[in-house]
Amino acid sequence: MTLGEIIFGRRPRPTFLTDAPADVRWRAIRPKPGPAVEAHLAQDNGFLQSPRGHMRYRAGTHYLITRQDGEQSVVKRSTFERTYRQRPDGQFEKRTDIRYRYFTLPHTVVVGTQEGPQRADAGDWIVEGVDGEVWPVKPDVAAEIYEPA
């Protein structure tokens, strides 16, 4: 126990979330047309550091995506192949005919994503994808990339 914990007590740990709570309000969304991304199938196993946590990837199982702003993410191969299409220039774009849904929570949670645990703060969107997978998105980012379906 640290001195801070002795004086102030232990900070509560965020709830670990793998499924949506039964009482959440779902909202339907779809991706907006957006800029292309670079993507390639992982050739080895590893971890990618993001602001929300470490995302693991496996050779042949995950795509590594790099957005125009340099932010990187990991997407399971089967999900990537269902939700992205390749452009003639070799880059990829998100399909806009795919529907997702999301909910928000009034408290911080750790979301169990396919790529590893990621932090979601109060008010962040927790999006459910085509395979039932969930991931957190900051509200300002979500407003840029999703629209009501």
Feature names for model-found ranges:
Residues 2-71, 77-131, 140-149:
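A motif-centric signal for short, conserved binding hotspots located
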